[in-house]
Amino acid sequence: MPRMSETVPTAAAGRSPQEAEIVAALGDRPVVLIGMMGAGKSTVGRRLALRLGLPFLDADTEIESAAAMTIPEIFETHGEPHFRDGEARVISRLLDGGTKVLATGGGAFMREETRDRIREKAISMWLEAEADVILRRVKRRADRPLLKTPDPAGTIARLIAERYPLYREADITIASRDVPHEKIVDECVAALHDYLCAAPPQP
């Protein structure tokens, strides 16, 4: 069965001045998390949304809800191209839904039209993880269709080579590593504030 769509409760009244400045500067733009499977987009995204007092949505969960199938079932029944088409439609819809934190699947940013829409309508944040970190994390999960291969480490290396050049187009890059999640969230908040609110350099 597909997972239920989810949001997190907002806590706007508890925002720090820095967090309030970020939300004001965002306007109606979402913060979109991109990166490889296992980079921590959903975990960090939920916590970042709580810090900013914004809704959180996971694009993969929304895709499953729209299709009434899990992502592995979509891959098995219809194939990856069908999944990517649906993914692009869902993300396009979510980008029009106001300010939020949105976690996207690892392959979503590879589609040019999706990159263009994110660039136009959102602030993109890449959670960059090393191959060994990704492999260690995803080995615990059985629901990764692209890793159902005899050589998961080789598959991850290939995906990194394909995807990281495009991920580098993100507005903000955060190193995802094995530290407490709140430390990563602190870095996300600081980077968002620097990107959105820092005064431009004086001439």
Curated annotation (Swiss-Prot):
What subcellular compartments does it reside in? Cytoplasm
Cofactor(s) listed in the protein's UniProt record: Mg(2+)
Residues recorded as binding Mg(2+), renumbered to this chain, are 42
Task: Identify the metabolic or biological route this protein is part of.
Answer: Metabolic intermediate biosynthesis; chorismate biosynthesis; chorismate from D-erythrose 4-phosphate and phosphoenolpyruvate: step 5/7
Source superkingdom: Bacteria
Q: What's this chain's function? A: Catalyzes the specific phosphorylation of the 3-hydroxyl group of shikimic acid using ATP as a cosubstrate.
Q: What is this protein called?
A: Shikimate kinase
Supply the source organism for this entry. Rhodopseudomonas palustris (strain ATCC BAA-98 / CGA009)
Q: Which gene encodes it?
A: aroK
